[in-house]
Swiss-Prot record:
Gene Ontology CC terms: cytosol
NCBIfam families, sorted: glu_cys_ligase
EC class (word): ligase
Alphabetized GO MF terms: ATP binding; glutamate-cysteine ligase activity; metal ion binding
Database matches in HAMAP family: Glu_cys_ligase (MF_00578)
Entry keyword annotation includes Endoplasmic reticulum: no
Family statement: Belongs to the glutamate--cysteine ligase type 1 family. Type 1 subfamily.
Pathway the protein acts in: Sulfur metabolism; glutathione biosynthesis; glutathione from L-cysteine and L-glutamate: step 1/2
EC number: 6.3.2.2
Species for this entry: Pseudomonas syringae pv. syringae (strain B728a)
Protein name: Glutamate--cysteine ligase
UniProt xrefs under Gene3D superfamilies: 3.30.590.20
Length: 535
């Protein structure tokens, strides 16, 4: 390990955190995971059945809910200090869900199964309360703007935070004019800038969607190649077609690139987008000819979460509070990494070893010096990311760094050298060697592209002479067998069932006791709430 490659800034911060009295701060980082996955039939068709009541109410169950569709489940772990407990929690949620799924399966990869016509993809339903109806109309708006097919892509979201005491410690040694909350927000935004610079590395290491079902494209033009079978499209060197420009494409969002210079400019750009009409949406309006809502408003974004990004600054919201309101009022609390594919070879879609590396990587982004992104850097970051998701395993692939080409493997290895001392520090804090082991596993992938998940997906399809759907169904069946043969303990099962029952009661109570405000007025108040925010 060449420590001299580290910046003086990073070395100073690592030395401070590595002091005996401070090392325990690194044990207090929090990790949470959200995993989306489609429910499918035994024949790999979308399960168009309602969200199983035995899983509770999607509106009020904090661990098992739905994302875009009734068929798209989302599993949410609490934020825990030990990532092993986070992964174990995710595993238990899967086992509970499988106990209630009947003959249905959880789809193993990020890219969807063969989908029915758009009108037959069911939008998630959240009941008759105003907030439930708002969530439903928002999803109708997404269908109108982007189509339902795109909304059926699944992923892993990884939430990470440092303890506030760690930021307070770092602030003491740095010349920063604001208060502790401002410094913490400033530091998380700096983390996001570095994440923009280096997140292509995560796509190389963990991208797992090099192929998809041809029907996903709905006849649109593309540059993919047909291979394996008539219904499979792929790119030979792709790592993550999910994160490529095949996914979300939005003319309305094309000019919306929130500035990550500071929290104020970020929240201002999003607030402007949720308050600025967009002509094609205005022409459609908010209601159809029958007077039914079709979208919440005609602005660039209906709500701030509609903005699609690889990482978000976050703050836990109070009841009825919007994400921007929480950020403006109380600053950034954690980041949500949103670009991770589901690994179809893993029952939960993510492993503890991967989690260890992500911790070290995100911590590197947090602790390394992070100048504001110049215009060419923003452009380079976007083009590097797109290059890696579409052809990251291409031999000799070059990326752009400081406006000069650099070999991907050279740059990736340099980044590994810089992340290694952070992994070592995390290991020292926790009395383990797992973070350094994870670095070695990732370096092996850099040295040999065949070890990447994307290459392994294609190799498995080739070895079994099967297309995308057959491969995905086979993996889904393997994982179903694993979860069904490893049931929860009686107490764990009872706890999940009690939580599901409570969530149904909570939704019923909400619907029964809600103040009588008509939905139009409720939406108007919700929209007005964002216009009244002042930084």
């Amino acid at each position: 390990m060449k420590d001299y490659t580290l910046s003086e800034f990073l070395n100073r911060r690592l030395a401070l955190l590595g002091e005996r009295n401070n090392l325990s701060l690194l044990e207090q980082c929090l990790h949470g995971i959200e995993r989306e996955c489609l429910r499918v039939t035994a024949t790999a068709e979308l399960a168009c059945t309602p969200h199983p009541q035995a899983l509770g109410a999607a509106l009020t169950n904090g661990q098992v809910t739905t994302d875009y569709s009734e068929s798209l489940l989302e599993f949410i772990t609490p934020a825990l200090k030990n990532p092993a407990e986070t992964i174990d929690n995710l595993d238990r949620i899967h086992r509970f869900v499988y106990s209630k799924l009947g003959d249905e399966l959880l789809w193993s990869p990020s890219m969807p199964c063969p989908l029915p016509d758009e009108e037959h993809i069911p939008i998630a339903y959240y009941g008759t309360s105003n907030i439930g109806k708002l969530k439903y109309v928002y999803r109708k708006g997404l269908a109108l703007r982007y189509g339902k097919t795109m909304q059926c892509i699944a992923g892993i979201h990884y939430n990470f935070s440092l303890p506030e005491d760690a930021w307070a410690l770092l602030k003491q040694t740095e010349d920063f004019a604001g208060d502790a909350r401002d410094y913490q927000s400033h530091s998380y935004i700096a983390l996001i800038r570095n994440f923009r610079r280096y997140s292509w590395l995560l796509m190389y290491l963990f991208g797992a969607s090099p192929a998809l079902d041809a029907g996903f494209l709905r006849g649109r033009k593309h540059q993919l190649e047909q291979h394996f079978d008539a219904d499979t499209l792929y790119l030979p060197y792709a790592t993550s077609l999910r994160m490529s420009d095949l996914g979300y494409q939005s003319d309305a969002q094309a000019d919306l690139t929130p500035c990550y210079n500071d929290l104020v400019s970020y929240t201002d750009s999003l607030r402007k987008a949720v308050a600025t009409p967009y002509k094609p949406y205005v022409e459609v309006g908010t209601h159809d000819q029958n007077g039914e809502w079709v979208q919440l408003n005609t602005n660039v974004l209906q709500i701030e979460n509609e903005y699609y990004s690889n990482i978000r600054p976050k703050r836990v919201t109070y009841s009825g509070e919007r994400p921007i309101q929480a950020l403006v009022a109380r600053g950034v609390q954690y980041v949500e990494v949103r670009c991770l594919d589901i690994n179809p070879f893993l029952p939960t879609g993510i492993s503890l070893e991967q989690s260890r590396f992500i911790d070290a990587f995100v911590l590197y982004c947090a602790l390394e010096e992070s100048q504001q992104l110049a215009r060419h850097e923003c452009s380079n970051a976007s083009s590097n990311f797109l290059s890696v998701v579409k052809e990251g395993r291409r031999p000799g692939l070059s990326l752009m760094r400081d406006n000069r080409p650099v070999d991907l493997k050279t740059w990736a290895t340099e980044l590994m050298e810089k992340i290694t001392p952070i992994a070592r520090l995390l290991d020292q804090a926790q009395g383990i060697d797992e973070h350094l082991k994870s670095i070695a596993v990732q370096q092996a992938k850099i040295d040999d592209t065949a070890l990447t998940p994307s290459a392994q997906v294609l190799a498995s399809m080739e070895a079994h002479n099967e297309g995308f759907t057959a491969f995905s169904l086979r993996q889904s069946q393997v994982h179903a067998e694993y979860f069904r043969t490893h049931p929860l303990s009686a107490q764990e099962q009872a706890d999940f069932e009690a939580q599901a029952k409570t969530s149904i009661e909570e939704q019923a109570e909400l619907e029964a006791t809600e103040e009588v405000v008509d939905f139009d007025t409720f939406v108007g108040s919700y929209q007005a709430s964002i216009l009244s925010i002042s930084n």
